[in-house]
Amino acid sequence: MSAGKLKFDSPAPILKLSKNTGSTPPKVGGTGQASWFQSLKEKKRTGTPPTFEGSGVPDNSNVKPQFQHGYWKRQHRYKPGKGGRKPVADAWYFYYTGTGPFGDLKWGDSNDDVVWVKAKGADTSKIGNYGVRDPDKFDQAPLRFTEGGPDNNYRWDFIALNRGRSRNSSAVTSRENSRPGSRDSSRGRQRSRVDDDLIDRAAKIIMQQQKNGSRISKQKANEMAERKYHKRAIAPGKRIDEVFGQRRKGQAPNFGDDKMIEEGVKDGRLTAMLNLVPTPHACLLGSMVTAKLQPDGLHVRFSFETVVKREDPQFANYSKICDECVDGVGTRPKDDPTPRSRAASKDRNSAPATPKQQRAKKVHKKKEEESSLTEEEEEVNKQLEYDDDVTDIPNKIDWGEGAFDDINI
């Protein structure tokens, strides 16, 4: 992401390591050597270990302060190439002291592939029983740093908190992280299942939330759709054009094909793409911000760019979604078997058929009328037709007494 300059989220959320079913993780991890957390990755291959602003210990409210110490382990990575595999930028994984591949080391022991870290108040002579992660039961946890973060040569991929994942996909990701060189051997499998992974997972999140009782009332859904425009959100059962207006090609708003417009959040592609959307802090502090005073008020523009690296396992999937949904109005996914909406079909079937002869006469008559118009009248007529097309999309939004409110998404 181009927001890589931002090294931490503020304020940092409380991290709860949780099972897919929502239960609390065990005090002792399962089999294997998988880290509880996602990795740090070098932006440029230097081989230099990361340095940290702050403690360097990832946030985890499940771990007592005295046990908030551990190490970052170097994971050498490779990619296939002519003449054999070639090294790429290193990844680093965090383990608590006494766990993981170097669980036999004492805190501070010298090792070229280890960086020791501890939080304020931690006692490195005491080791907790937090173990390592069982990839068949637990997901990787997102990295969050309350006290700063790694230096500017390191980044980490965005992972939403409380995300839903299948057990199989969790296991694949964890094994990839834990084995040297396995990133390349598993890449083919990841590419082949990329379409099933991200979109299906996003759709399952919505279904699971509904099963767990996190339903939204009709009143709440309407309230979400009627907020100030920049604070609105799509609730289940709402069409995109009902909340954010009709889609247009080549100008805002232009994201969404007909399937996404109709289904809203039920379309897993929408939830998947939210992974690329900046947080309010990132949007404000990582954007090119311009402000112009116009007759109708102050226009503030935020220009933000999110970069999906080509080596990202979901790169092909994000590219496909963008191909389908950027300027996608009037189209549907090629593999979508869904026919046109029943309401539209019903309207067409119930409408009386117009004889071809009558339709031809009507068009012919219109052409005769238009041909009798002067050039000036034709220009005026075209403008009127254009205005009719966009009457439901106001150029100016009436915010009421103030442009901002206390409601946050």
UniProtKB/Swiss-Prot annotation:
- Outline the extent of the CoV N CTD domain: 217-333
Disulfide partners:
C322-C325
Q: Which GO terms describe its molecular function?
A: RNA binding
**What are the start and end residues of every segment in region (Disordered)?**
1-64, 167-197, 327-409
Q: Where is this region: Dimerization?
A: 228-335
Keyword terms: ADP-ribosylation, Disulfide bond, Host Golgi apparatus, Phosphoprotein, Ribonucleoprotein, RNA-binding, Transcription, Transcription regulation, Viral nucleoprotein, Virion
Q: Which GO terms describe its cellular component?
A: host cell endoplasmic reticulum-Golgi intermediate compartment; host cell Golgi apparatus; ribonucleoprotein complex; viral nucleocapsid
Q: Does the record bear Metal-binding in its keywords? A: no
Residue numbers of Phosphothreonine PTMs: T374
Q: Where is the composition biased (Basic and acidic residues)?
A: 176-197, 332-349
Q: Does the keyword Cell inner membrane apply?
A: no
Region annotation (RNA-binding) maps to 30-161
Q: Provide the assembly information.
A: Homooligomer. Both monomeric and oligomeric forms interact with RNA. Interacts with protein M. Interacts with NSP3; this interaction serves to tether the genome to the newly translated replicase-transcriptase complex at a very early stage of infection.
Q: What does this protein do?
A: Packages the positive strand viral genome RNA into a helical ribonucleocapsid (RNP) and plays a fundamental role during virion assembly through its interactions with the viral genome and membrane protein M. Plays an important role in enhancing the efficiency of subgenomic viral RNA transcription as well as viral replication.
Protein name, UniProt field: Nucleoprotein
Organism of this sequence: Avian infectious bronchitis virus (strain V18/91)
